[in-house]
Amino acid sequence: MTDSTQTPDIPLLDAVQARLLGCLVEKEATTPDTYPLTVNAAQSAANQKTAREPVMNIDAGGVQHALRQLETLGLARQHFSSRADRYEHRLQAALDLTRQQTVLLAQLLLRGPQTLGELVTRSERLHRFADADEARHAIERLQQRALLVVLPRASGQREDRYMHLLCGEVDGAALAAKYASSGGGSEAADPGLAERVAQLEAAVAELQAQLAELRG
């Protein structure tokens, strides 16, 4: 992050654009050999059944349209090639973020509201935080820039949850209530085990994305 006092404008994304942007950040770290992503690989990443909330089913045309919109917003860049066009994210550069802030935003783009502990654990393949304080500091900086908000706690919740604001203002009370009514998601019983399973399933999804890449 630079020392410039001029704060970049914050773009307003729709749900598909947000999902694709999060995928580009994620795959830059987890599948560097096939990054930047083709439209097919980006579609596979966006429609993963694991490590995504909500699960989406975006067709190739919708993916390509969203990627082009991200490029117009300065959040992605297209690379032309003889075989297939590819896309890379520019989230960190466009919004003048640190690596830590970029990774945290990506997790929120991909999986919605999360606690500090969930963000630290789920970010390990993208950036290994030294401790919770490092992540907390990055969250505070994002909050100061109105890129992130702390959600009100619903009944029975013991930890704060955070949500990005790249899709505009959120109904914090409704999101908190939705999370509480779901029992905290599938991770509530054993978050460590659930996360390891999610990582294995994500690895399978990445292999599928690589196959899609080879097919064109």
Swiss-Prot record:
Pfam families given in the database record: DUF480
SUPFAM superfamilies per the UniProt record, alphabetical: Winged helix' DNA-binding domain
Domain of life: Bacteria
Family, per entry: Belongs to the UPF0502 family.
HAMAP family: UPF0502
Protein name: UPF0502 protein Smal_0052
